[in-house]
């Protein structure tokens, strides 16, 4: 509501009004009047009876509103009354007390800010949005794909962005999409999808309602939320599939979605039919054993379904991540705000259902440590060394995928990591070996650094023999 300052009264009448009306309430608010201003209004009414000429100083409708019933003490300020039309129109012309404008300002939520991380992506400096603990992961996952596709660009010095700005960029992208088919039916369907997507946009900042099916990595129950991904051409994947080598689980789960399966479990467990009870227990066991919402069969199907270089959204554990496929391996974009200053940490490998992963830079080169710049490990970050490490890592991943499903999963990868660690220890062993050589001399007899533990246990006996001699 706009606040209008009243016109200055005539010089001959100002003294009478100032004596009866408080300074903070020179113009009454009518039905919107604050309960604390009741006394001021009564005083003004008495002044109006004593000085009829003073009523010309106030709008005529505001004077009529003096007859409206007073609000009860302690009640909230009343809303617009269901009176006559002129009374509603004159409320806009009346200014409210100075205390009331604070209430809309206190109810207004503070904007959400997100830090922007700039990375080198395919030769161009590209922004990605990081998130805090409970950030809007659906919105960020979609927007990061649009940034990596260069469909949305930010100013070069942009360091912080709000959720409203992200929503505005996303809305512009949706409105700029044109239907590929010109038939009337398809255009109407396209317009309906656009309307559904624009309606769903506010939910992207809090979370989307998606219902995965256990039959395929791209199988979801269709909801209006899915229209956003369809319009933008962004694939939506998950890896929560039933292993076809478990026929009991396949029969128990069938082609149901997650919500339907939960309802079936509840129904079967309370059934008097033993077969239904057994089916419900098998389905419940499947949900418990796959609580990570990613199975080995799902990971294999996901790797096969994703296209090389494709940017997609991966759904797991109610979280949406930006995913890509590089050289037949899957990677998730690292958007944790804790890695904002880690330039060498951009992607995280997705090769295991247990969460054991490795960090990579924007070129998918393996990152060895956190918080260390180039050359911090004594030359181990040279291009030749980095290339060898990357090749070893890719070979280990390939061997892992060729393993039988009954094995321990990461045996070859762990072996490669162990060999890599031994190689690092050999590079750093030059100084300790020199110290051990020096310790054998008379000047360094008391030094024990670098000796094995068993050698230290046997040393006191040898020294005691020398002392006795």
From Swiss-Prot:
Residues 34-53, 453-469 have a biased composition (Basic and acidic residues). The record marks 412, 415-416, 419 as: Ubiquitin-binding. GO terms for molecular function: cysteine-type carboxypeptidase activity; cysteine-type deubiquitinase activity; K48-linked deubiquitinase activity; K48-linked polyubiquitin modification-dependent protein binding. One of its GO terms (biological process) is proteolysis. GO terms for cellular component: cell periphery; cytosol. It is an enzyme of class 3 (hydrolase). The active site is at residues 137, 319. It catalyses: Thiol-dependent hydrolysis of ester, thioester, amide, peptide and isopeptide bonds formed by the C-terminal Gly of ubiquitin (a 76-residue protein attached to proteins as an intracellular targeting signal). Residues 388-426 are annotated as: Ubiquitin-binding domain (UBD). The modification Phosphoserine is found at residues 103, 441. Residues 1-85, 428-469 are annotated as: Disordered. InterPro entries: MINDY, MINDY_domain. Its EC number is 3.4.19.12. Keywords: Hydrolase, Phosphoprotein, Protease, Thiol protease, Ubl conjugation pathway. PANTHER family: NF-E2 INDUCIBLE PROTEIN, UBIQUITIN CARBOXYL-TERMINAL HYDROLASE MINDY-1. This is Ubiquitin carboxyl-terminal hydrolase MINDY-1. It comes from Pongo abelii (Sumatran orangutan). The lineage of its organism: Eukaryota, Metazoa, Chordata, Craniata, Vertebrata.
